[in-house]
Amino acid sequence: VLLSLQSICKRLAHLGLKAHYVGEITEPAITPNDLLIVGSASGESLFPVAIAKKAKALGAKVAWIGSNQESSAAGLADYIVRIPVQSKLGRPDELKSIQPMTSLFEQSLLLYGDALARVIADRKSLDLKGLWQYHANLE
């Protein structure tokens, strides 16, 4: 899940938005002007729930992406995106997968991030060719 969230963060940065992931070496302080995006299929994973609680205590908004809409993480969220696929809880309302564990959730999260980036680019009328200015150039 972390890799998918890091990829979403990268997509948002490529749109010229200030985006950081929790734990990166240059992570700034979160403020009431910020949005924390957490992902957890079950919504009960300790780290996402703990950082969501901390972000709320510091006045930030929280968006949660996951499967279990009755979870602790969902209860903390200002915004919810439900991806109703297999989680560690194995709830009957989750789409089952032949893939192990939460692979389908991680893949769906990555695709959701790509779609979100495209929607933001369209709504901001961004010139997609102009976005290369934000792409890494030490490659």
Where in this protein do the model-derived segments appear?
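Glycine-rich phosphate-binding loops that contact phosphosugars or nucleotide phosphates
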Residues: 2-111, 117-118
